[in-house]
């Protein structure tokens, strides 16, 4: 049986675990994980004009403007091999991004990681570290690297993101809640929205998503 082309989205506030779920999913399926955050960090790493602009916005807990985000995401989708489709991580976040996406693509299903305890989420983020080379994500509470301060994938140093602090997390959560409601409502009305508790075991979260893969 030939695999079909799946077009998925995963939504959720910062720290809900979108990246972790998607990376584990991509290891066991042919779905390509497309994270807007990774695209931003790659642009920042390249020190391009867009990258410097993005760095300034993210450091203050804001979101990158829609035009830049749309450009980076769509260019990735149209210029990279996607054998069984993709899962978009953290995109779209605004109505303008949603309008752009609807012109370009038809989405099959949307998974929303729901946060029921903000304090628990803040604790999770306070203990998050990333690889400064390949952007792999770890958590010092429940997903530690095999070697302290060293990435399992490339052995590079692990660092804490500048925006992983309580004040910025709260600011990003407030902004997320303000902007996500129209996105949530749109996909809910289309009967394409599946909500998943972000504090469930990862195996259960993955099982829920995998049942929709064609």
UniProtKB/Swiss-Prot annotation:
Pathway(s): Purine metabolism; AMP biosynthesis via salvage pathway; AMP from ADP: step 1/1
Region (LID): 127-164
Reaction(s) the record says it catalyses: AMP + ATP = 2 ADP
Subunit structure as annotated in this protein's UniProt entry: Monomer.
Keyword Electron transport carried by entry: no
Species name: Mycoplasma genitalium (strain ATCC 33530 / DSM 19775 / NCTC 10195 / G37) (Mycoplasmoides genitalium)
Name of this chain's protein: Adenylate kinase
Region (NMP): 35-64
Keywords in alphabetical order: ATP-binding, Cytoplasm, Kinase, Metal-binding, Nucleotide biosynthesis, Nucleotide-binding, Transferase, Zinc
Residues holding AMP: 36, 41, 62-64, 90-93, 97, 161, 172
Chain sites annotated for binding ATP: 15-20, 128, 137-138, 200
Chain's role: Catalyzes the reversible transfer of the terminal phosphate group between ATP and AMP. Plays an important role in cellular energy homeostasis and in adenine nucleotide metabolism.
Nucleotide-binding listed as a keyword: yes
Lineage, uppermost ranks: Bacteria, Bacillati, Mycoplasmatota, Mycoplasmoidales, Mycoplasmoidaceae
Domain notes: Consists of three domains, a large central CORE domain and two small peripheral domains, NMPbind and LID, which undergo movements during catalysis. The LID domain closes over the site of phosphoryl transfer upon ATP binding. Assembling and dissambling the active center during each catalytic cycle provides an effective means to prevent ATP hydrolysis. Some bacteria have evolved a zinc-coordinating structure that stabilizes the LID domain.
Any one GO CC term of the record: cytoplasm
GO molecular function annotation: adenylate kinase activity; ATP binding; zinc ion binding
Pfam family of the protein (one): ADK_lid
CDD domains with a match to the protein in the record: ADK
